[in-house]
């Protein structure tokens, strides 16, 4: 049988999602806990492989198992065997056609900026601290140039292994709630470091160091070296993955939890 899970995690102390030799990862921890509950080796597939220090409130995985378990075993039972910074949010049986990555039609990320003179104490691993005056309205205006299917070479990591630089951005919004600025972006898929590279360049606009039109110019240049530095990882969250409606997967608050959804 095939089971899908909704996962959230604080990626601060992990070397990314993907299992790696000699370093800790979210995938390794989750597979260990699932294998214990299933009493057999479990290998999982995820919707999006997050980098070191990146978080998720809406990660989705699936796995195959011969074990027959109640839903509570895949939620409460697995959570008991996970570290405190990883949690299963829901579980659902799915058909054999479902694939966490390839069935997904869109992914959504939120990047949380803590815009304050002083660094945070409590949320230091869940936000990226950028002091000084930031104009989120100009960031939002500039971000609209990203909409649609385009070549995102200027926002693609050098080590990106995708066969194509083209992605389709469905929506992007930059909003402020007090000292928090949220860059919320949804696309069919994302290139390696694409969101953080976009945020880095939007911040240049927000600080007034570049005009709103600069984002459009960067897209046309198709040159990563012309864009801004990659934004820090700790403000980034994978908050949602979209699937065909007939799967009826649970939809929870996007998060992170301090956002007023």
Swiss-Prot record:
Catalytic activity: uridine(38/39/40) in tRNA = pseudouridine(38/39/40) in tRNA
Enzyme class at the top of the EC tree: isomerase
Keywords: Isomerase, tRNA processing
InterPro entries according to UniProt: PsdUridine_synth_cat_dom_sf, PsdUridine_synth_TruA, PsdUridine_synth_TruA_a/b_dom, PsdUridine_synth_TruA_C, TruA/RsuA/RluB/E/F_N
List of residues binding substrate: 109
Role this protein plays: Formation of pseudouridine at positions 38, 39 and 40 in the anticodon stem and loop of transfer RNAs.
HAMAP family: TruA (MF_00171)
Name of the featured protein: tRNA pseudouridine synthase A
Organism of this sequence: Shewanella loihica (strain ATCC BAA-1088 / PV-4)
Source organism phylogeny: Bacteria, Pseudomonadati, Pseudomonadota, Gammaproteobacteria, Alteromonadales
